From Swiss-Prot:
Belongs to the enolase family. This is Enolase. NCBIfam families: eno. Its EC number is 4.2.1.11. It is an enzyme of class 4 (lyase).
Length: 429
């Protein structure tokens, strides 16, 4: 009864008004799964290929009708008749059908849409929530959220170099309390920014995007907001950064335009981070070095890797092969997991398993171009990741993931687990 009878893709819009792909998979029993594919702004060069049409006369060249056609005309014929519960088999079938390293023939967006819709259809078939279907009976840990409350870099039209300034309500007793704390700090930050005469418009991920005097001022106003909301920085709430350094790196030099000394070598940039870590309760830095600056990554890991979580995003692009190379070289101690960087659920789960075995933490992440799809919320609980990064406390494309986690926490009830500060097991070596 779990045989696939139909697969259908359509073009929809993401949170930035750009086209993306939505896929529906129907089963013989009448069960159905629907999945929408996200899209990134700052992307790693080794990410799986997001197939766009390139027709400048339509959606400025960003249409995805080619990917839609690849699902409806090519992939559908191959997977119809297969059992939806055979996730690995279906994903392998699509990988073989594409035959390229970065899924450039069919498009990672086409493949991922089908992969996730299949999992959702199978979950619907057996009457389980998606997190239960993927994770089994041991899926019970609600993630500590990284909440992006000030946006900069490629995610905002302002003068802030660092792409994301985040809060982590690590002192919360459960996910619902963590969400409340984050929301209260978000509103306090708006008041702090207004009082200083700063713009309170928001960026792609729902965080505020003011022009500030320096990158450090972003940390200062966040600290003020945490205190204003009635919480203690470093005790109730920790800080995290996503620098997106590949966007700042050219000809062996990092350029932070909003700093007194804009151009920095890798060593000088690590000095900059170390100074911030000494002054503020920063627990995590993502993409602190450019994706191809492996020497810089090694130095940063050696200097800061026992004090803070060092997350590889553009560095690893959710790719098990690249992650293994990083593990072997002792680079970073955490991986950001983005479904569309690798393009199938199976490969995503492989990367998570590899990271955990190596003692690396995993952070399940959204993209800056999101939809109302809440798969990543379920995924974070399914694999007991312990951390999730899904934007600020406004914009429905971000909040829908938080709301799904509230539902899951309710459903798990007494068996729900929330570890708070204990999620940073990579710092206990």
């Amino acid at each position: 009864m779990s045989q696939i009878t139909d697969v259908y893709a359509r073009e929809i819009l993401d949170s930035r008004g750009n086209p993306t792909l939505e896929v529906e998979v129907f089963l013989e029993s009448g069960a159905m799964g629907r999945a929408a594919v996200p899209s990134g702004a700052s992307t790693g060069e080794r990410e799986a290929l997001e197939l766009r049409d390139g027709d400048k006369g339509r959606y400025l060249g960003k249409g995805v009708l080619k990917a839609v056609a690849n699902v409806n005309d090519i992939i559908a014929d191959e997977v119809i008749g297969m059992e939806a519960t055979d996730q690995v088999g279906i994903d392998r079938k699509m990988l073989d059908l594409d035959g390229t390293e970065y899924k450039s023939k069919l498009g990672a967006n086409a493949i991922l849409g089908v992969s996730l819709a299949v999992a959702k259809a199978a979950a619907d078939e057996v009457g389980l929530s998606l997190y239960q279907y993927i994770g089994g009976s041991n899926a019970k840990e609600l993630p500590l959220p990284m909440m992006n409350i000030i946006n900069g870099g490629a995610h905002a039209d302002n003068n802030v170099d660092i792409q994301e300034f985040m809060i982590m309500p690590a002192g919360a007793k459960n996910f619902a309390e963590a969400l409340r704390m984050g929301a209260e700090i978000f509103h306090a930050l708006k008041a702090v920014l207004k009082a200083k005469g700063y713009n309170t418009a928001v960026g792609d991920e729902g965080g505020f995007a003011p022009n500030l005097k320096s990158n450090e001022e972003a940390l200062q106003v966040i600290m003020e907001a945490i205190t204003k909301a009635g919480f203690k920085p470093g005790e109730d709430v920790l800080l995290a950064l996503d620098v997106a350094s590949s966007e700042l790196f050219k000809d062996g030099v990092y350029t932070l335009e909003n700093e007194a000394q804009p151009q920095k070598t890798a060593d000088q940039l690590i000095d900059f981070y170390e100074n911030l870590v000494n002054k503020y309760p920063i627990i995590s830095i993502e993409d602190g070095m450019a994706e191809n600056d492996w020497d810089g990554w090694k130095k940063m890991t050696e200097r800061l890797g026992k004090r803070i979580q060092i997350v590889g995003d553009d560095l690893f692009v959710t790719n098990p092969r690249i992650l293994k190379e990083g593990i072997d070289k002792g680079i970073a101690n955490s991986i950001l997991i983005k479904l569309n960087q690798i393009g199938t659920l199976t490969e995503t789960l492989d990367a998570i398993e590899m990271a955990k075995r190596a003692g690396y933490t995993t952070v399940i992440s959204h993209r800056s171009g999101e939809t109302e799809d809440t798969t990543l919320a379920d995924l974070s609980v399914a694999v007991n990741a312990g951390q999730i990064k899904t934007g600020s406390l406004c914009r429905t494309d971000r909040v829908c993931k938080y709301n799904q986690l509230l539902r899951i926490e309710d459903e798990l009830d007494a068996v729900a687990l929330f570890r708070g500060k204990e999620v940073f097991y990579n710092l206990k070596k």
